[in-house]
Amino acid sequence: MAAFVAAALAQIGDRTAWLAAILSDRYAKPGLVIAMAALALFAASGLAAALGAVIGPKLAPNAQQLMLALALLLQGGGSFFPAKAPERLDRWKIGAIATTALGLFILAFGDGVQFIVLTLAARTPVPALAAIGATIGSLVVIVPAALMGEAAWLRLPLKPLRIAIGTVFLIFGIVLALGALRLV
């Protein structure tokens, strides 16, 4: 559940949803974009969760909590900066399926959600649930973006939403960090 909520909040105003909207407009196939987004997001989250499963047992519980706090603080801090427009992938000539799947995978693998997935997977006995939750949570935002298209997506009040969500991430990150350091 934590991965679902964190991913859904983090994707609002993020570049992955924006790229999904761009590709949906280009190919006029929102269903294809959504399917490839699900595949790409699950692959990226699965890799992050697998790494978390390897790292988690090597860390003390406080270290796991501190790592999650850091992930939330980084995601929250990044939310205060405007999202840079994603590469439109205009020069990619590998077809709609491959362009969408690879483009979204590359973008998703580098975003803050994956660090959150890694840290959540490190703390749980079933790391795959972090990947599944993050994938579904991300799709909660990416599906509407793909269905709306870029122009409608960008008309949403994304900046104030990013700031509000960033504030929430920062608050939770600070509380978790203070708890991990035994300061509260």
Q: What does each model-found stretch correspond to?
A:
Residues 174-184:
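Juxtamembrane boundary at the C-terminal end of a transmembrane helix
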Residues 40-44, 95-108, 163-175:
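Small-residue-rich segments of transmembrane alpha-helices in multi-pass membrane proteins
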Residues 54-65, 125-134, 156-164, 184:
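Interfacial loop-to-helix junctions that mark the boundaries of transmembrane helices
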